[in-house]
Amino acid sequence: MDKRYLDKLNQEKFRVEKNTNPYKKIIKEGDELDTEKFVNIFGSPQQKRNYKKTKKLVQNTKESIMKKALQYCKIDNSTSGKYIIKEVLNYSIGSKIVKFIYNEKTENNLFNLILLKVVTYSILTNINENNGLSFRLKKYAEQFTLINYNYQKFKYIDENIKQIILEDQGISEISLHNFYSSVDESINGCLLNILNVLEEIKAITVTKNLMILIKKDEDNKYYKVRATEEEEGIITKAIDDYMAHNKVNYSDLFYKTKIKDKFDRYMKSTLDSIGVISWYRTYEVFIINSTLMNYILDYTDFDERDLPIYYIALNYLFADKMLKNAKNKKEKRLLQKIKSSGNVEQYLKENHIDIENLTRNNFRDFIPSEYVEREKKEMLKITEEKNSKKDFTKLSQTYIEDEETEKISDLILRVEVNERGRIEPLIPLFNLGIDNSKEYERIDISEELLLNGGNRNE
C-alpha cells in the first residue's frame, strides 16, 4: 500500500477513540425514563430550562431531543411519557443516519437510507486484505441500479450508431448531453454523500485517487495502478490548462463529442510523455471501525435477502428524481424566456398559456390545468401506494411534460423485472441493433420475492 495512504489510515484509526458514547455511564439497557429524565439527559440547556419552567414538552422539542438520543441508543416511546432504553450503542451513529430513518417518509431520506444500507453492505463484503476497497462511482451506481447497464455503454458507443438510435428514438443530442451531465453529477453527489456520512462518524476514511493504465515492457502486459504524485500533478495540470485555454467545463470534456475528441488528442501527448495509456478517477475506501459498520446494518434493519427490493427502490427513486430535475430546469428556462420576452401577452397567447396566471410565481400555474390535475393524481397515487406497502415494482411514473427526457430515462436509467426474475434495462440496447455480446452482471430475484410483489413476508 502507498505510504501516504497508510499514514492517513493509521491516523484515522487513532481518531476512532473520539467517536464514543458519552451516555454509556448514565443510561443502560432496560432503563425506563419519564419525560423529565429524558429531557435532562438528552436535552440542550435551553430545552431543559423551558421544560423546567413549563413542565410541557412540545412536539418539535420532543422530536429534536429524540433525534439526538437515537444517535446513542435505541428507544421505545410507544407509551406516551415513557422512554424505554432498548439498547445503548458503543459509538455514536451520527445525526444524518438518524435523520434518514426518522424522516423516512420523505423520498429523499428514504433514498438515502436505502443507499446507506447497500453501500455499507457493499464495502463490508468487498474489502481487500488491507481492509480497503477501490470505489468507482459509476461501477457501483450500476451495481445498485441507480442506472442500468446501458448507461456507460451508450455514452461511449460509436457516434454513428448513437446518431441512428437518437433519430430512431426521437432524442436530440443536446438533450442526451444535458441528461448525462445531470445524472453523472447526481451519481457523484449521492454516493459521495453516503461515503461522507460514514466518514464523519469515523467508520471509514476516503481518499480520492487518480488511476492510470500502463504497459510494462518486461511482460508486455497492461496494469491499472495508482498515479504517483508527480504523474497526478502532470495530468491534473494538463486538464486545468486545457479548460482554462478553451473556456470549457469539466463535464464538456466527456459529453460533447467535438470537445472530447480535441481534448483526447491534446491529452495524448501529455500521457505519452509519462508512459501512460489512459486515466480515470476512483475513491479508496478503508474501514477503520468495522464494528460500527456492522452495527449500521443492524440499526437500519438491513436484511441481505431484501437486496433486490432495495435495488428496485433505488432505481425508481433515482430515476424519478432525475426526471423531476430535468423538468425543473425546463421550467426555469421557460420562465426566463417569458420574462425576457418583449411582448409577454403575445408570447403567452402563442404558447396557449393563461394570461391570468402571469402574476403567479409558481411555474405549475403556467401549465394547462389538465396536466396539473393529472400530475396531482399521479403523485397522490404514488404516495398512497408507498404508504400502504412500499411496493416499488408497481409504482406509477410521475407525469413529465418532456417526452424526450422520458425516453432517455427509459434507455439509460429505468429497469424492469423480466420473466426470468432479473433486473434489466427497460429498453435493452440489443433491441436497438447494438452488439450486446459483453457479459454484464445481472441481479437475480427469487420467485418468492416476485410472488409477493417485491415484499418479503417474515
What residue spans do the PLM features occupy?
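Electrostatic interaction modules used in gene-expression and signaling proteins
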Residues: 1-458
